[in-house]
Amino acid sequence: MSEPRFVCLSLGSNLGNRFKNLQIARTLLGEQAVLGLRSSVILETEALLLPGSPPEWDLPYFNSVLVGETTLSLRELLVTIKQIEKVVGRAEESPPWSPRTIDVDILLYGDESFCCDHTEITIPLSNLLSRPFLIALIASLCPYRRFCTQGSPYHNFTFGELAHHLPSPPGMIRRSLSPDTMLMGVVNVTNDSMSDGGMFLDPEKAVAQAEKLFTEGAAVIDFGAQATNPKVKQFLSVDQEWERLEPVLRLLKETWSNRKQYPIISLDTFYPEIILRAMDIYPIQWINDVSGGSQSMAEVARDCELSLVMNHSSSLPVDPKNILSFSVPIGEQLLSWGEKQLKMFSDVGLNANQVIFDPGIGFGKGAAQSLATLYEIAKFKRLGCPILIGHSRKSFLSLFGNHDPKDRDWETVGLSILLQQQGVDYLRVHNVAAHQKALSVAACEACAPI
């Protein structure tokens, strides 16, 4: 095995679920090619197109930069990258400059003076200086590394210097996004939600809200027609819940079916029948089951090949008196419950990679217990599945002040930063725009320069 060498890669995506595309590519690169992988933030940029390109190619990109070390030769690394691009879904014969599910480029390789000019690859990347957003991302990770290309007016400049001299033109960068923690945006098709009840009962308003959340940076959109807050004493029947959801899903099918960029669509329900009906209309991908995931729901997830969010709850409807023990650490109780659920799911044939763990903030927990749960993420990671936290605007935030639920976004964002630092995979939130701004800046701590 050869000695590890420095490597710097760029990831780009402007087709499909761009968050998931970057995430899958990054994971595979870390497993197969790059040691000690570190990621920049994600920058959404306008597409760079040649004059006369089809207008349907003009789709914004998500871009990020990865640095680390590799024991692969340049040729071996290139072959591995092509294989990973294929796994993520890139078409083999896509025209140059056309939209793509994933694009992985080798920007830098080896020591600073290493150069390569071959028909298959050029190091440093031949058009790197015309991609100022990539220069800025490299500078965020390794500002003191030098750009070495004989004959270039920028030869021997550090990337920090390059970023200073070659800033992105106005309008090129749309925004920055967190590279690690993805957001689930909430659309409550209810009249009795604590924070926005009645706002999105109309199907057009519900779909418009989903569009807004996606535009603001949600990787997942969670539609729910059944409120489960403590004030709800009786749930809707299957038919009543479906009466609210069906027109939303039909409008979603009408307006979103041919989209080139899209989020994961999730349904917040504990009725398996709702999922089966929904699958006949729109290809949802997640089930968000606040009951914790019954055997029948696990079987539906298995048969339909959907992801299942198992949300811990002590009772439904929520009973404030039915809460977890105060004498046993909250993390241990939730970990034990999660292990039992995963065992049951495994017994019915649901793969572990289809399960997402939600400790259920506010479900069967007092306010102090809910807050304590947010500090137990490392323990929950023992389950081996992604972690989702739904703390947005919930009543336990009254510990920080007696505010109306819709006015709890800043408390929510503050705790979301804490959760991102602990490696939470998904956050279920109402205010996506505020979260993306805060989390992308907070992510800079994890990608501090070396």
UniProtKB/Swiss-Prot annotation:
It comes from the Bacteria. This is Folate synthesis bifunctional protein. GO terms for biological process: folic acid biosynthetic process; tetrahydrofolate biosynthetic process. Pfam families: HPPK (PF01288), Pterin_bind (PF00809). Mg(2+) binds at N188. One of its GO terms (molecular function) is ATP binding. Residues 183-450 are annotated as: DHPS. GO terms for cellular component: cytosol. Its cofactor is Mg(2+). Its EC number is 2.7.6.3, 2.5.1.15. Residues 1-166 are annotated as: HPPK. Keywords: ATP-binding, Folate biosynthesis, Kinase, Magnesium, Metal-binding, Multifunctional enzyme, Nucleotide-binding, Transferase.
